[in-house]
Amino acid sequence: MKPALCVAVVSMLFGVQLAHAACPSDAVFLILGDQIRGYSLRANGATEPCQVLQGPLTTLMTAGATVIDKKDAFHVAQFLTSSTVDIFPRKAEGNEAPSRSFMLTITNDLLSIAVDSHLNDFVLTVRPSEAGVLIAPANSSGPITNAIHITDPNIVQYVSIAIDSDDNLLIAGYDIRGAAIIDTFGTSRNMTSPPLLRSLTGSKTGLLPGAGLFARNNMTIAVDPRTDELFVYNQTADVTQIQVSVFAAKANGDMPPVRTISGPATGITGSGLPGNKIAISSDGRLLDAEPNLRILAFAPGARGNVAPSQIIEDSTPGPVTLGGIAVRSRGGRQHDGNDDDQ
């Protein structure tokens, strides 16, 4: 019997989960509470995952927001699991323990995460008593009791964070009136007390109001790793309006988007669980996480009521809900050196 056939028979008879090879350099990952599932960025239609990370050793229980750093490691923020952030190497597979973990002991409710070029972790907590961004130094491990704490006086409800190519921190949320606002702080200049560099808000932005719902990712921000354009997934609290607005790099004030993706043809639906809803590949594709293990990909420059250029669907039926999405692709500022040196 041929080896591949033998393995397939053993799997069928004894219920053994087959191991996958690590995903290729260009891949997109869904984060689903207790697991991470990866797919080639070239995939279209029903697709078997090229990488699955799941099992008790992973410690994943409430995984949602996730980011991939310049060394291709996964940084996974667990929403309710003892304020834990787990870091996994690029080729982590199956029931594999994280290479390291740290715990932000003063809080929980971790809704968003970003990593700068120095591998410092920026973690957004929405727990009311500690709401804001906590910074864990590069290579942190174990309990962290003295993390730098950044708050934004303009925001009363925090929702999402990102890091731009200058290593500055973007914070998205809602002000006291429920209006959407995205502030940029100069963390590249000063970590402990960063200056406010830009504030994107106002009627011309077209950003939808949506305050009043605790720990829902009704707004997710992501920065194009090549152009620094700002993508904003945005929905109203009642989910009657959904859009992705794209702003020019370093957009400031009451500035309109350069384009907006919205309408029934897009297939983009609302979201309610913690985790980042969108991610941007190095070639400018918008990747949108949808329920039932689906990913919608939109071509660079897509605008209006446009259908996705790719729909990646897991070949295994999945949960209705979703948690987060992360992308790894060559050519962007987040990746340097040899992608295989992991």
Name each model feature, range by range.
Residues A21-Q342:
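Flexible "stalk/tail and boundary" regions
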Residues C6-G15:
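Bacterial N-terminal signal peptides
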